[in-house]
Amino acid sequence: MARSLFKAKLLLAPVADGISLSISRRGYAAAAPLGTISRTGIMEKNDLRPAVREDSGASSAWAPDPITGYYRPENRAVEIDPAELREMLLNHKVRAH
């Protein structure tokens, strides 16, 4: 009885492997066309975008700071001393009640 079960296991193992391989292959085959269709759709949308302007030259977003010499972003505002800022913002007028 044990020999017959062993032989049945040996005969059924390749069949089971073949079935599982065919199922997994079928799954990949069904998924592949959808992936290529969506990819081409993305590529077509990129072609419809307006072209990026190239005449801006070779400018960089970073420029040397005239005071320190270190590079900093070009669009950065000038730093104000905290004491000067406080002086500008505080209202020193005294109101009579």
UniProtKB/Swiss-Prot annotation:
The keyword Cytoplasm does not apply. The keyword Manganese does not apply. Induction: By salt, drought and heat stress. InterPro entries: LEA_3a. Keywords: Stress response. Belongs to the LEA type 3 family. This is Late embryogenesis abundant protein Lea5. It comes from Citrus sinensis (Sweet orange). The lineage of its organism: Eukaryota, Viridiplantae, Streptophyta, Embryophyta, Tracheophyta.
